[in-house]
């Protein structure tokens, strides 16, 4: 019998086809866990959501929101950018292969991904909004999950999934390699003897009914169904910044991290907690059909509290009555699409996309200006834009080569070019928002770090010949995880492990394969809510140290304009930018202090470097979980005195700058600093 899989809300892909010997081709012993009880049950699920408010619920949570698991339980849904793992339970020697592109061209596809409408009162799907298209909206790829080799699969969304929404998927079992699990079959076919069983039976009936209405596929062909909601990290960021604004407005002298986190945890929940139900205020629309910007009044509160510090006047210099659009950004995923020529599309974002703006600014530079940049392609900011703006057919060709070529080409394409694919302009994304002028002469070259950190350093190093007046823009790629390039990047690197061990003297702060939580910032800082609380603390720590002539003089005349956008999954990776030097020769155009830029070193050093921030040590100390291990707390306590001395640099890089990086030009630059994290939606 042909069988299908449905996932509602973000989805997971079902797997068509078996591997192994000829004797195993007809095997039907493989199945999917449903009740989230086994190691194979790794996908988001409606079963992990509270019935009364839709927030996530984890069995190990407590009432203390400084507990990371408990803080994560305040989330309204799963990331809009993450790939969904599907790990079948298989017998030894049996593999379940991903469906092929050809199978998706059949009249009945092996997998369906659907976006569903969500009833915020009943907290469950109420209909199907859209059946998403394979190769356009999502792809199915092999996963490196530690299961039977070749069995694990992942559904990789190409644009971000819709925020504050639900999704579903369905797959067809063309070779009968997957069957319904016994738990799913029991709940589906039996009404149940208690309230829990009856509720699950009703959910399965609802999910399969909606799928049949949208596709015409009968429920007896469905072997699995589930749904879950999504939440954008950008929505949460707006809420957290709003909390910071309210705290600082009430007490403009100091920003107490503990007070901020308490306010955020109890009074500034994201998404529907900000606006119960579906009746949200009318907000500024995103261009190109993107979702409306949430919490407009929160943005106003932020602007009122922080003035030009958060809103760079050069970036957003418009009358208050004129809407400032938020543009779209295509994230750079870890894996390229598994379909030749498939390219990610702009994803819904709720914060302005710096790459898009800089790209469009560079597009406005004339050919003579490009020649004036010197050195030809890649030698200056305009050449930098040229290097990023490859024709679609060439980029598609590289994408095919990256997916289907040999291992060396895959590594080269994924590591060296993936970040360039993301820099595609979105329609009506605020062209000219950043213009070449005395302060930003030729646009803003970008420094990347993240999953392609080492390759980005190598590639950008060839294009970093900046002239005075060019302002580097530090961008963090969405969903970076480090260690993706031969296991060398991120906090999982050996250099990072050594740095953290020296820092705290405890292995509890070191990320290993057995202990990934330090990398996720979940073991030592109260930043579980999408790591956003720490990003706000980092932002203001940077503002304090950069706000000349008087530290902490936020928004005062002559203070440095710092525009912080987003967050970084790793600890304090965003502000890898600079030391600072006072410069009292303020121009009429508003150029702030002179800034000396340091080439971003190895990503793993940024977390340790943040601890050297004067005035930031207490914040780190406060962030140590009260429930953390004794040696972890002792390690930070011993290191705390190192955080109180006034350093010459905002962040002192532990990795020396490599030769040939053109620092002499950037050292003479007089421009504002923009500290940027991921500008897409999701968990980073």
From Swiss-Prot:
EC numbers for this chain: 3.1.1.3
GO biological process, one term: lipid catabolic process
Enzyme active site: 568 (nucleophile)
The keyword Lipid metabolism appears for this protein: yes
Stretches the record annotates as Disordered: 321-405, 462-493
Keyword set, alphabetical order: Hydrolase, Lipid degradation, Lipid metabolism, Secreted, Signal
GO CC, alphabetical: extracellular region
UniProt signal peptide: 1-48
Subcellular locations according to the entry: Secreted
Subunit structure: Monomer.
Functional note: The optimum chain lengths for the acyl moiety is C6 for ester hydrolysis and C6 and C8 for triacylglycerol hydrolysis.
Family from the record: Belongs to the AB hydrolase superfamily. Lipase family.
Name used for this protein in its record: Extracellular lipase
UniProt gene name: lip
């Amino acid at each position: 019998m042909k069988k299908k899989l449905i996932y509602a809300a973000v989805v997971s892909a079902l797997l068509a086809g078996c591997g192994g010997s000829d004797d195993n081709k007809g095997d039907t012993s493989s199945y999917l866990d449903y009740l989230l009880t086994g190691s194979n049950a790794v996908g988001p699920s409606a079963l992990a959501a509270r019935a009364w408010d839709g927030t996530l619920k984890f069995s190990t949570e407590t009432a203390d929101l400084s507990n990371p698991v408990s803080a994560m339980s305040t989330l309204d849904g799963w990331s809009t950018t993450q790939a969904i793992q599907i790990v079948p339970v298989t017998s030894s020697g049996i593999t379940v292969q991903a469906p092929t592109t050809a199978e998706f061209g059949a009249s009945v596809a092996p997998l369906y991904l659907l976006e569903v409408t969500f009833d915020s009162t009943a907290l469950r799907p109420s209909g199907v909004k859209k059946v998403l298209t394979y190769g356009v909206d999502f792809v199915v790829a092999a996963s490196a999950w530690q299961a039977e080799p070749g069995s694990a699969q992942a559904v990789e969304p190409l644009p971000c999934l819709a925020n504050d929404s639900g999704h579903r998927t369905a797959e067809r079992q063309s070779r009968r390699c997957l069957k319904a699990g016994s738990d799913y079959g029991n709940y589906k076919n039996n009404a149940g003897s208690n309230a829990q069983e009856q509720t699950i039976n009703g959910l399965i009936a609802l999910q399969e009914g909606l799928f049949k209405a949208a596709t015409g596929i009968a429920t007896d062909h469905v072997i699995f169904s589930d749904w879950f909601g999504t939440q954008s990290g950008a929505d949460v960021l707006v809420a957290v910044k709003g909390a910071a604004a309210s705290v600082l407005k009430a007490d403009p002298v100091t920003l107490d991290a503990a007070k901020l986190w308490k306010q955020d945890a109890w009074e500034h929940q994201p998404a529907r907690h900000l606006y119960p139900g579906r009746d949200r205020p009318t907000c500024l629309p995103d261009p190109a059909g993107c979702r409306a910007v949430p919490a407009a009044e929160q943005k106003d509160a932020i602007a009122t509290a922080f003035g030009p510090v958060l809103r760079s006047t050069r970036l957003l210099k418009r009358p208050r009555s004129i809407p400032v659009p938020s543009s779209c950004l295509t994230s750079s995923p870890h894996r390229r699409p598994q379909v030749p020529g498939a390219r990610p599309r702009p994803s819904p974002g709720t914060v302005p996309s710096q790459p898009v703006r800089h790209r469009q600014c560079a597009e406005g530079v004339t050919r003579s200006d490009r020649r004036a940049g010197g050195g030809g392609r890649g030698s200056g900011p305009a050449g930098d834009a040229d290097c990023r703006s490859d024709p679609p057919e060439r980029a598609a060709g590289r994408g095919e080569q990256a997916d289907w070529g040999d291992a060396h080409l895959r590594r080269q394409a994924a590591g060296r070019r993936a970040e360039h694919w993301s820099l595609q302009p979105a329609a009506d994304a605020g062209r000219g928002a950043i213009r070449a002028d005395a302060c930003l002469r030729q646009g803003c070259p970008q420094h990347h770090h993240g999953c392609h950190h080492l390759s980005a350093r190598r590639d950008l190093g060839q294009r970093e010949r900046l002239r005075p007046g060019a302002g580097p823009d530090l961008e963090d790629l969405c969903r970076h995880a480090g260690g993706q390039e031969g296991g060398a990047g991120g906090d999982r690197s050996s250099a990072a492990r050594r740095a953290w061990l020296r820092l705290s003297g405890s292995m509890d702060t070191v990320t290993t394969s057995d202990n990934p939580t330090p990398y996720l910032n979940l073991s030592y800082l109260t930043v579980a809510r999408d790591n956003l609380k720490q990003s706000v603390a980092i932002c203001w720590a940077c503002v304090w140290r950069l706000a000349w002539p008087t530290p902490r003089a936020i928004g005062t005349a002559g203070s440095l304009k710092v525009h912080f956008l987003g967050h970084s999954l790793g600890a304090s990776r965003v502000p890898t930018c600079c030391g600072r030097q006072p410069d009292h020769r303020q121009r009429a155009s508003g150029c702030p202090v002179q800034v000396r830029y340091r080439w971003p070193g190895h990503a793993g050093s940024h977390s340790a470097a943040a601890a050297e921030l004067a005035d930031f040590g207490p914040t780190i100390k406060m962030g140590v979980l009260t429930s953390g291990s004794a040696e972890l707390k002792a390690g930070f306590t011993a290191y705390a005195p190192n955080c109180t001395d006034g350093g010459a640099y905002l962040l002192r890089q532990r990795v020396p700058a490599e030769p040939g990086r053109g620092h002499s030009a950037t050292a003479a630059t007089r421009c504002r600093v923009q500290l940027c994290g991921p500008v897409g939606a999701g968990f980073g």
